[in-house]
């Protein structure tokens, strides 16, 4: 599982870069085996603290490996050295559990690359997607989870269920879900949405004209 959320980065890890550059093979976890870059005030980072609290170790026997990439992915981060979109297309799914987004382009970008996504109805995209999918059903390409101020654990459970449902699909079913992702993304292309911007500007100009007169 990749957590690609920017934090207060200090620098790229020299020890990790050496392992990658020299193609060193080992089953022993490194010091702080979750994070690709050193952070300022690492002891206060909420992501690292929760990973530790949850008991993850990234050992060879762990079924789930976590990689926290805390930098902006511009292709020059010193470790991955690939832009965000080149990494996105390598994912099986994405999760953007928005607490508030006027629109939220990241889940739309995900399905535009055929990567099924999980979002919430507190994102504008999530509200739009709910008009085209039945809800929290990742098989449709987008799962929209209901979220409010009081249902944190229910949201976590719903996201977990969606991930497990996707993980249980076979190759053919996964390919169909990717196709549905592409199809839904096509409905949100700029050529479809430009009419709403034109209407908004028309209304704004009308009101401005009335004020001037």
Can you name each region flagged by the protein language model?
Residues 190-213:
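C-terminal alpha-helical cap of glycosyltransferases
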């Amino acid at each position: 599982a990749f957590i690609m959320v920017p934090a207060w980065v200090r620098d790229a890890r020299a020890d990790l870069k050496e392992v990658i550059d020299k193609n060193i093979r080992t089953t022993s976890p490194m010091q702080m085996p979750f994070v690709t870059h050193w952070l300022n005030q690492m002891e206060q980072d909420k992501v690292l603290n929760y990973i530790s609290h949850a008991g993850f170790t990234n050992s060879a026997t762990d079924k789930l490996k976590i990689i926290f990439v805390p930098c902006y992915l511009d292709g020059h981060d010193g470790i991955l050295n690939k832009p965000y979109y080149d990494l996105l297309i390598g994912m099986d799914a994405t999760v953007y559990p928005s607490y508030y987004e006027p629109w939220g382009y990241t889940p739309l970008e995900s399905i535009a690359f055929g990567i099924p996504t999980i979002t919430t109805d507190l994102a504008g995209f999530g509200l739009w997607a709910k008009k085209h999918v039945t809800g929290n059903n990742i098989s449709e390409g987008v799962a929209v989870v209901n979220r409010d101020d009081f249902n944190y654990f229910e949201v976590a459970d719903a996201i977990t269920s969606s991930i497990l449902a996707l993980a249980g699909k076979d190759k053919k079913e996964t390919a169909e879900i990717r196709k549905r992702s592409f199809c839904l993304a096509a409905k949100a292309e700029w050529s479809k949405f430009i009419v709403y911007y034109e209407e908004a500007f028309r209304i704004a100009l009308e009101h401005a004209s009335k004020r001037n007169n």
